[in-house]
Amino acid sequence: MTTDDRAKAVAPFGFTPRQARFLALVMRHAGVCLLRQYATFAGIVQGQKTRAFFHKLVSHRHAISYACRHNRAKLYHVHHFALYRAIDEPNSAYRRPIPANRVAERLMMLDGVLTDPGLDWLASRAEKAAYFTNGRCSVPPEMLPRLNAAAAPRTDHAFPDKFPIGIATDGRPVFLYVVLPTVRDNFRAFLRRHATLFQTLPSWTLRVVLPRALADAYEGVQAVVRDEFESPLYPHTVDELKWYFEQRRRIGSTQFYPSDERFIRAADAFDAPRFDSLYHCRYCGR
């Protein structure tokens, strides 16, 4: 089903086309939402129309409302089985109660999607793999992102990240990434998993969603992108990096570093977060 198909399936429950499209996006990508997100999506002020819509959701038992911290707003969880069945996702995990520590991530994910609600947003692994291996893209399965690049190139192992991918009318994909303040950021690993796919596409967009608390991290995000895509590693550098990593692994936890001049030069050259991340991915399973 496309986004339009899902909206048409939800509308018979008594919703306007605009409300139905919003609900379809919520159920596919978050399960929860705020009044301000609908107001932004609809291009209206957060007034009577918005409150009436959410009152209807609660009164018809399509959603449950929860008071947010300090009672500054209400969180709405869309859980009604028939609505999810209408969009062909009756077993969606988004129907289940959401842990408090996942709310911010879900809302940020929805914010990212609502930035371009007209895109056809792909949510599942199967949808993503089907789009990129068929049709106009025709990307070989071995070039799709996966956690273990050495694993067999099966499409069901591809796209381990849960972030949705939006598809524009011209076929250009928009890759979404949500930066979370409460967990170790895996942005570099995300970029590396997708690097081969990015290289095969004629055009693509990377959209990074940052919480307000991390607004100052924008420059850092840009620096990571420049590191990964604008500073390629040439074959000789890769060979030297592998040698250096192997020496580090042998040293282990002894904290004894050799006085070998080659090792000292390599340690100085590769003293950067980019290479630390590569080392931990290679030897520490992170």
Regions found by a protein language model. Name each.
Residues 32-34, 86-95, 170-176, 205:
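Glycine-rich, often proline-containing surface loops adjacent to acidic residues and nearby aromatics
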Residues 90-92, 127-144, 196-202, 271-281:
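Short flexible/disordered coil segments
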Residues 169-286:
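C-terminal regulatory/effector modules of DNA-binding transcriptional regulators
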Residues 26, 42, 54-58, 112-120, ...:
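Hydrophobic, Leu/Ile/Phe/Ala-enriched alpha-helical segments that form helix-helix packing faces
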Residues 97-188:
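Exposed, interaction-prone assembly regions rather than primary DNA-binding/catalytic cores
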Residues 79-106:
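Short, amphipathic alpha-helical interaction segments positioned at domain boundaries
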Residues 1-86:
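Basic, Lys/Arg-rich alpha-helical nucleic-acid-recognition elements, primarily the DNA-binding modules
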